[in-house]
Amino acid sequence: MSLQKTSITFSPGRAGDTPAYIALRGKTRQNAIGQERLAELGITAESWAEMIESGNLPGQVCHQDGQLIGYCFGDRESGEIVVLALLPEAEGLGIGKALLDRMMAELSAAGHARLFLGCSSDPQSRSYGFYRHLGWKSTGETDQYGDEVLEYLFT
């Protein structure tokens, strides 16, 4: 019997990889959004790449044995965590937390003392407990998509 080793790597998001980010977004277990719906929202591989290249949308990505399995992107100007997405097989391994931690550190280093994000208000949603467990708190506000706004304050 041989044990298979897997290689997990983290790196900054790259503009040239946005088609893969779009594809992964449609494969998440909850809140999957396909390419057509993203385009309706104004998010295309081209627009995403432009935001990365401008420096306004930094991101952290994770690969397992060279395959993209997750990412987290944030808005450098506002301090918003824009998206955290993982393939279902990457859930429960600490990868989501690691990606979020890296993105939070990057936005903190950019001068943000407060970060925010939109999250499902349904307690049955995985994201509901995930963010709260990590110290994110409800602001009592709802964003334009009907999601609850959570914030994280660096102390």
Language-model segments: what does each one mean?
Residues 117-127, 144-147:
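Conserved beta-strand-loop-alpha-helix junction that forms the acyl-donor binding cleft
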Residues 1-16, 155:
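Conserved N-terminal entry element of GNAT/NAT acetyltransferase domains
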Residues 12-18, 22-83, 87-89, 100-102, ...:
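Acetyl-CoA-dependent GNAT
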Residues 57, 145-151:
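Short hydrophobic/aromatic beta-strand or adjacent loop that forms the aromatic wall/cage
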Residues 97, 122-140:
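Conserved active-site alpha-helix within GNAT-family acetyltransferase domains
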Residues 87-93, 121-123:
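Active-site acidic-Proline motif in GNAT/NAT acetyltransferases
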Residues 63-65, 152-155:
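Active-site beta-strand termini and strand-to-loop segments that position acidic
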Residues 107-120:
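Conserved GNAT acetyl-CoA-binding A-motif
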